[in-house]
């Protein structure tokens, strides 16, 4: 496939509202808790399986897995050591090996702050990894936890990623507010949206 080709997220109305996720996109989901990320990660993985994509899940955090074990998804366990360089190099080796057009899910980046005792290193990891993924026309989903990081760390991510989507939820609705959508043309992409998972609507 060609760079910046549209892909399917598994939520058709979200594709329409955001003018699609594209090859090369790093998609950061800023959430209050990881269940909010799962609302969007699960259909993304299910769609990628249907589309016979090369799907890789980077597993390094202590939280519950974000992707269920299945033969269609490669689960890569990367020990989350205190060494920024070692961890980053191991991730990049896998990305290089998997090559073009791969689809990724990363564990929560907020856990990097705990391991490295600073969230600026989390921002540095993203700033190094994101352009490499972009150069290989991949798609990658990353969750971060809202309110856990400094302005400077979040700014590094915001300046580097192609999409940053804020997700909020209550017992009745899931709300999405795009904070950054790069190189799209849609009248609705910066509007707040309500996602009703059971109905599949995103309006």
Where are these regions (language model features)?
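Glycine-rich P-loop/Walker A and Walker A-like loops and their local beta1-loop-alpha1 context
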Residues: 2-62
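Short glycine-/polar-rich loops that comprise or flank the Walker A/P-loop
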Residues: 24, 52-53, 137-138, 159-163
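Hydrophobic/aromatic beta-strand patches that form the interior of the parallel beta-sheet core
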Residues: 27, 56-58, 74-76, 141, ...
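Structural recognition of the conserved hydrophobic beta-strand(s) that form the central parallel beta-sheet
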Residues: 29, 57, 105-106, 138-146
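Conserved nucleotide-binding/hydrolysis micro-motifs of P-loop NTPases
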Residues: 34-35, 61-65, 81, 109-111, ...
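Conserved inter-motif catalytic segment of the P-loop NTP-binding fold
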Residues: 51-114
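Substrate-engagement module of ASCE P-loop NTPases
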Residues: 115-116, 121-148
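Phosphate-binding/switch region of NTP-binding enzymes
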Residues: 145-203
């Amino acid at each position: 496939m060609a760079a910046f080709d549209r892909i399917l997220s598994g939520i058709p109305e979200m594709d329409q509202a955001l003018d699609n996720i594209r090859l090369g996109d790093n998609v950061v989901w800023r959430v209050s808790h990881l269940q909010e990320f799962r609302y969007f990660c699960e259909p993304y993985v299910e769609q990628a399986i249907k589309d016979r994509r090369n799907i890789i899940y980077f597993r390094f955090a202590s939280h519950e897995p974000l992707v269920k074990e299945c033969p269609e998804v490669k689960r890569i366990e990367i020990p989350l050591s205190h060494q920024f360089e070692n961890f980053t190099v191991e991730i990049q080796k896998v990305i290089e090996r998997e090559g073009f057009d791969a689809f990724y899910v990363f564990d929560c980046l907020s856990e990097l702050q705990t391991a490295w005792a600073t969230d600026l290193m989390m921002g540095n990891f993203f700033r190094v990894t994101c352009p490499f993924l972009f150069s290989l026309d991949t798609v990658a989903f990353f969750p971060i936890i809202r309110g856990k990081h400094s302005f400077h760390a979040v700014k590094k991510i915001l300046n580097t990623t192609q999409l940053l989507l804020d997700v909020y939820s209550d017992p009745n609705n899931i709300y999405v507010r795009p904070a950054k959508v790069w190189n799209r043309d849609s009248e609705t992409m910066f509007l707040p949206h309500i996602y009703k998972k059971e109905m599949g609507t995103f309006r």
